Amino acid sequence: MLDWRLASTHFILAMIVMLWGSGKAFSVDLASQEFGTASLQSPPTAREEKSATELSAKLLRLDDLVSLENDVFETKKKRSFSGFGSPLDRLSAGSVEHRGKQRKAVDHSKKRFGIPMDRIGRNRLSSSRG
């Protein structure tokens, strides 16, 4: 089965090489002849010339607008924030805490940090066993 596939593949490749060498396979001459006859059939009319000039004018205008937009749009300068080691881009400053939102200062002195208690209220580490 493998020998039959190998033989058929070699046969197909040999046919492609022979046709390629004779110039009959993948001929470029036909495409160039069709293009040449289409361009010689009739000269462009005034309407086609007008639309071509309008299109070129629009393209030039768009190109000018794009270049103006690229000139106007510049990256914003970087600012350094106190408390941070490296300067941040102004566009990414939204991730930093806003100064308008101030959080309440939590008074930690009211909380008692001691030995953990269980639900009943006794110390988990009791001195008596049992």
From Swiss-Prot:
Induction: Is regulated by nutritional changes. Is up-regulated dose-dependently by insulin. Is down-regulated dose-dependently by forskolin. Induced in muscle following physical exercise. Residues 1-25 form the signal peptide. GO terms for cellular component: extracellular space. Its main location: secreted. InterPro entries: Osteocrin (IPR021088). It is found in: Secreted. It comes from the Eukaryota. One of its GO terms (molecular function) is signaling receptor binding. One of its GO terms (biological process) is endochondral bone growth. Expressed in skeletal muscle and to a much lesser extent in bone, brown adipose tissue, spleen and testis. Not expressed in neurons. Disruption phenotype: Mice grow normally and do not display any visible phenotype but show reduced physical endurance. Mice do not show skeletal deformities, differences in bone density, growth abnormalities, blood pressure nor body composition changes. The modification Arginine amide is found at residue 129. Keywords: Amidation, Cleavage on pair of basic residues, Developmental protein, Differentiation, Hormone, Osteogenesis, Secreted, Signal. Interacts with NPR3. Hormone that acts as a ligand for natriuretic peptide receptor NPR3/NPR-C and promotes bone growth and physical endurance in muscle. Acts as a regulator of osteoblast differentiation and bone growth by binding to natriuretic peptide receptor NPR3/NPR-C, thereby preventing binding between NPR3/NPR-C and natriuretic peptides, leading to increase cGMP production. Required to enhance physical endurance: induced following physical exercise in muscle and promotes cGMP production, probably by interacting with NPR3/NPR-C. Belongs to the Osteocrin family. This is Osteocrin. It comes from Mus musculus.
